[in-house]
Amino acid sequence: MEQAAKATISLSPPSYAGCCMAACPYRSTRHLRRGGGCSARSISSLRHAPSARVYAAAAAAATPESKSTKENDLVFIAGATGKVGSRAVREFIKLGFRVRAGVRSAQRASSLVQSVEQLKVDDDATSPAERLEIVECDLEKQAQSDIVSAIGNAAIVVCSIGASEKDILDVTGPYRIDYMATNNLVQAATAAKVEHFILVTSLGTNRIGFPAFLLNLFWGVLCWKRRAEEALIGSGLPYTIVRPGGMERPTDAFKETHNLVVAVEDTYVGGLVSNLQVAELIACIASNRRTAYCKVVEAIAETTAPLLPTEDQLANIPSKRQPPPEPEVVQQGETPPKPIQQSQRPLSPYTAFVDLKPPSSPSPCPPSAAAPAPTSTDTAAAGSSSTLNSSATGTPISVDQPKQQQRPLSPYTRYEELKPPSSPSPTPPSAASSASVSASPDTPPAAAASSAALDSSANGTPITGDQLNQQQSPLSPYTRYEELKPPSSPTPSTPKL
């Protein structure tokens, strides 16, 4: 049965020649089990869809092992023959997905198959028709197990069903389709453990406003759509709810003059958007499931809106739940990377910015080899200097180290013009003037003795004969100014014998 499910439709397949399921693929599983035969209408419908694959009977015979393994490139679309669903099928096929289209009646899917066959895709490996699978699935009447079999191993489920606008007199239409059928699909998707569920509802499902609230005149359709949203949120499945604006009047060319706007829930109560733009948004959500994880978005189109990527607009919408961490894929035989040893960052910024480093003080030059031999005085000074000039660790510098020239503390050694004028130093008297003063006949010996006592040093020690020659200036001004010298008292003459 699984081989027959994957085989292309043919009137005479090699292993199922004459089988009713091969000749009449559009018959449902329930009809085949009753032994229903093929009609001329069913065979004529095959001429319009020779390349489509039908999984109506094969889905029921799928093994549990095939259900447990989900295929990320396989999408199940409920309402694939509708305005949004048919465009979503084509958009998914353009992006490289395989689509399993769930329809009520396979006869009505012929136009969908023809539109898919006319697509032009970049991938020449498989034709667009080979990526489409038609499966009959009535969400209102079939049991949950049949719906799970129809979903199969699809990883993504898209629900774009809704009550028909033509049956406006059907009072129970919004309840049966917008709520009950959607709820049945949600429960089946939960049982099938799909990875993402995309639900298309409408503006105003959670906010009362004009003109969206006028849709509730159609037998409370917004209230039932809100009940379907609550059922999906409470199921625990990863979901994305799309609330588009009015899609009745805009055509596919609407996107050429109106840019798509993706907003947070309960932002708009009115607006227009085309079916094609909503289908492109659904395909973008399926391609970026982690970005659209558990989000409720509203979609309208405006002429004044900027043209922004849909992925960026989805990323700005807050999520209802935190997405799970991505699993780490570790290949067999792959050695773990070695930890990178990070060098310590220096505290000084001068290592990175050399131009900011302040100028260093000039280093003293070592003495040349032709320097004169140090005297005993220099050796003693060097010994005391070695004790004072110790390093930061307290180790004294040995005498054997070369004597370094100390930097002078005064700036006058480099800048002579800043040096203040020095006070005039008195010139020492000559030896002739000192001898004339001491040999003057007018000076009595007592005055000379008193002068010697007065001309003493600061500590009271009388000046000796050797120190008298080194005396700088006499204390008496009479040596220079004779006219100021007072008259000396007459010296008595010695008596003559």
Swiss-Prot record:
GO BP annotations listed: protein transport
Pfam families attached to this UniProt entry: NAD_binding_10 (PF13460)
Membrane topology annotation: Peripheral membrane protein
One Gene Ontology cellular component annotation held by this UniProt entry: chloroplast thylakoid membrane protein complex
Localization: Plastid, Chloroplast inner membrane; Plastid, Chloroplast stroma; Plastid, Chloroplast thylakoid
Polar residues composition bias: residue spans: 388-408, 459-476
Role summary: Involved in protein precursor import into chloroplasts. Part of the redox regulon consisting of TIC32, TIC 55 and TIC62. Acts as a membrane anchor of LFNR1 and LFNR2. Has a NADPH-dependent dehydrogenase activity, but only after preincubation with lipids.
Primary localization class, coarse: plastid
Name listed for the protein in its UniProt record: Protein TIC 62, chloroplastic
Transit peptide location: 1-55
Gene for this chain: TIC62
Location of region: Disordered: 310-497
Highest taxon in the source lineage: Eukaryota
Annotated Pro residues bias: 359-369, 487-497
Organism: Oryza sativa subsp. japonica
Sequence repeats by residue range: 346-367, 408-429, 474-495
